[in-house]
């Protein structure tokens, strides 16, 4: 039997940053797995979570749509948000569909797998855990904030975040995916509310740090109000290492292109500053390139460039499928 040679790439995160990267990676000839945070408790996901006692569907929905291979109109349908008064106000159709599937199947993961077939996704989507959790933050003044959606609204520096209950188990398939990975990618995304909730799952973090695969952090292009105000690129990685309890990130991708001033809004948002000395002290190899995309007037990572840079870290670079 011919030995499987496709590299296994695991991407960990959530929010709006992860789907951008996945759009580039899904075009590559790799085994792609996305491990997605389930800490969201705001907006449509928060309402569903509160009323149905299920995992919040929003981050998972966004990741699945990024990996989908369907008519763009189907994607638009799944992303449609009701702008009406009443019970449907603010709800996203895709969230409702995923929640309905979770009621029709034996588990939430089964629902994800069914929807993966419907959306013809390329890759595998796994929740970091199938158990409910709450993300809390201890602020600089000692106050405690309960709930992911409230943390960035405090206007205070965050000392640390932690989950309740603290013994939440990661989903076994997520742990297995990390164990088999040839490349582990973390981010981009909200540092405290999209990235760290995954790494606070002790068993998952232990598997990541023990892995011999390259571990790459994709540094955010912009700071985030209420989370990473005035942060440098090195500050992001320092916070990750502090929360996990050990240094484990080998490399980071950092955008070098200046973001046009007219795209820096609101005014408190700034481009993440470079700290080469800080990176050196952390022992992290920084890869500086033009990773900026400003398509549609939005600041994002350029998916194709990031995908190429990531796969160049594998022993054999993977080209696009023909």
From Swiss-Prot:
Keyword Cytoplasm belongs to the record: yes
Keyword Cytoplasm: yes
Gene Ontology biological-process entries: regulation of cell shape
Entry GO terms, CC: cytoplasm
Pfam families: CofD
UniProt-listed NCBIfam families: CofD_related (TIGR01826)
Keywords: Cytoplasm
Record's function text: Required for morphogenesis under gluconeogenic growth conditions.
SUPFAM superfamilies for this protein: CofD-like (SSF142338)
Family that this chain belongs to: Belongs to the gluconeogenesis factor family.
PANTHER family: GLUCONEOGENESIS FACTOR-RELATED (PTHR30135:SF3), UNCHARACTERIZED PROTEIN YVCK-RELATED (PTHR30135)
Name of the protein described by the UniProt record: Gluconeogenesis factor
One Gene Ontology molecular-function label: LPPG:FO 2-phospho-L-lactate transferase activity
Cellular location(s): Cytoplasm
InterPro entries linked to this entry: CofD (IPR002882), CofD-like_dom_sf (IPR038136), Gluconeogen_factor (IPR010119)
Main localization category: cytoplasm
Organism: Listeria monocytogenes serovar 1/2a (strain ATCC BAA-679 / EGD-e)
